[in-house]
Amino acid sequence: MKPTNYHLFDFLDFDTELSRNESLWKAYKPTAVYEKEGDIYVTVPFQKQKLANDMMADTDVPQEEYTLIIRQYNIGITRLFLGFGDYVLTDESEMLQFSDRIQKVPLFIKEQKGKWILSTEDGTKRAVINVEEPLLDRWSELLPDPQETLDITLYPDGKREIRLSAYDHFSPPRYDALPVAFCKRDGRKERATLSFECKPDECFAGTGERFFKMDLSGHTFFLKNQDGQGVNNRRTYKNIPFYLSSRMYGTFYHTCAHSKLSLAGHSTRSVQFLSDQALLDVFVIGGDTMEDILRGYRDLTGYPSMPPLWSFGVWMSRMTYFSADEVDEICDRMRAEHYPCDVIHLDTGWFRTDWLCEWKFNEERFPDPKGFIGRLKKNGYRVSLWQLPYVAENAEQIDEARANDYIAPLTKQQATDGSNFSALDYAGTIDFTYPKATEWYKGLLKQLLNMGVTCIKTDFGENIHMDALYKGMKPELLNNLYALLYQKAAYEITKEVTGDGIVWARSAWAGCQRYPLHWGGDSCSSWDGMAGSLKGGLHFGLSGFAFWSHDVPGFHTLPNFMNSVVADDVYMRWTQFGVFTSHIRYHGTNKREPWHYPTIAPLVKKWWKLRYSLIPYIVEQSKLAIESGYPLLQALILHHPEDKLCWHIDDEYYFGNDFLVAPVMNSENRRDIYLPEGKWVNFFTGERLEGACWLKDVYVPLEEMPVYVRANAVIPIYPEDVDCTDEMDLSKSMALRIDNDYKGFWNR
């Protein structure tokens, strides 16, 4: 076993053999603090350590000094910037997109005994730098005195108190966390760490699409995008270097480097961050509500745009449809039997060779793609196409891509570790750090969009060829950022050609929320797959993303990955979950059309019609989301952060601000339901209840799902049955009033 349970090895990643070419440098107390152009500059000396479980200062080596910059923004955000090398503080970053609400405000220094107090002009305290000697009652010389430390407490919004972990150690030489430190290897500064104190009862959430329970405390996560290969493990497609705390603050680590984040995992006293880059650029966001904090994060990294109306309808797909005739038959049957549907997605089977992505239709199976797409459009269907950001060895474009460096040249051959079912040899990754490669890629999509395609599925993007020469960035930094560059390119050309900004994306990093929308990857068609998907969606919504979807009723099957039968109850329960998600798409390794499940097909149609009735509400809540910090799928803690129970509930959620949804995820048709504080009305029966309370062991027939709505809410609904959103005129929407006369949706 490799773990040692010691900070130096397990968190800071030092080799247990302590090779001589690595060193650790610990921050000491500042020697100078001064103001420059409204920022505070702090001179911090760093002392080399003798590496061992008991760390001691290596006083034979001179200290090195670096400058910590503290910057304050007007909406309760404090920024810490510390570069170990030639790094400069800048707002120029693909990850950053400051809103008009972000304004730098000057900080002023007031020196007191043993402290520098940093305040804004109105006198609000924003940080305290403590250099006072710790109080001692000396009676023993058995152990050495603690080394100097960097002791800073932040007050980002003037209320919340967030302190660096100045003294997280057992005996002075044995550390469990360091406030700030950096590492060298072969003389090069390579890693940096920063730690904040955490409280015994503190809870955490966010960090991306995390397939974990709601409270993430006690866990350590590797922020490195990779093919998740399911939704029930530690891997994830969408890491976001941001977390929320129950102490009403959030932290955004502005980096795309591979990183490690320990939320009271290695030490229960500290939140620790380790970056593979010798740079720390950290935004600490305070707020009175969780929504305030999430909005502050979006103020830094960008707000989501509004998806088109048709995207809120039903999407139908499978892996895969193989011909225009097959698609026509399915679409015609949908209309004939009045299953409302807006999008048909073509996955891996529209190319001349299945999975061989050449961005061109198979001429035999799709002989007239423009006519085919136009025919579907007249019938109310949009077309979405699968593709990916790699060029295969035998692809038509390979010579052009290589000759022009549109794919990054490989330095050695590599094996894939992703879910490449085709066994194709991907010769290279499209280099989105190279503007000419980005324009070339946009050109490939443009010819498809000009045919009438309305959405590009930007699949993959988590993994890139790591032994390759990219024009603008080292692969170690590009790996996480790649999702943002990839999706931005597809989004921009789609909006340019069609007028609608949209992608269907699997990977993500900070800033990707600007380019909706994302889905949850390759879940299993099982109860645990459904539960894992919901957990991931909840944390994703707490990471700045407004829109999210998932494959209904799961992507793959078990025990046979491609061919096992999906159970009727899984299909039905997942349908109900999908109806109350921002976007609903059916997809998977075998047939997903409802008539293949004849026992429940009438119920599915009923729930699809409910979905279309709710589209005015979904549009209303989406407009709110793109101007605030709200997602559509909302964890209970977003509204009830003070309710400790809500920090342990990951199988219920708010849908928008008015619905409370409790999906059933078992074959027994039973579950416990928690109603948080407030007055609630059963959406389907009109029954009135008051929270906070538990409803224990509730029996829920397959045709029903526990859905509650706030008493006295007004829900806009569409009053007519339609086959697609093209038939909708939202001015005809009606107000469904959840008042004392409300008897339930089916009984209105």
List the predicted regions and their residue ranges:
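Conserved structural-core and active-site-/substrate-pathway-adjacent residues in large, well-folded domains
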Residues: 70, 124-125, 242, 334, ...
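Aromatic- and carboxylate-enriched substrate-binding clefts and catalytic-loop regions
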Residues: 83-85, 145, 155-157, 174-175, ...
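Catalytic core of carbohydrate-active enzymes
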Residues: 491-496, 500-501, 508-519, 529-532, ...
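Active-site-proximal structural scaffolding
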Residues: 63, 235-236, 244, 273-275, ...
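Short, well-ordered loop/turn elements at secondary-structure boundaries
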Residues: 112-114, 122, 236-239, 244-248, ...
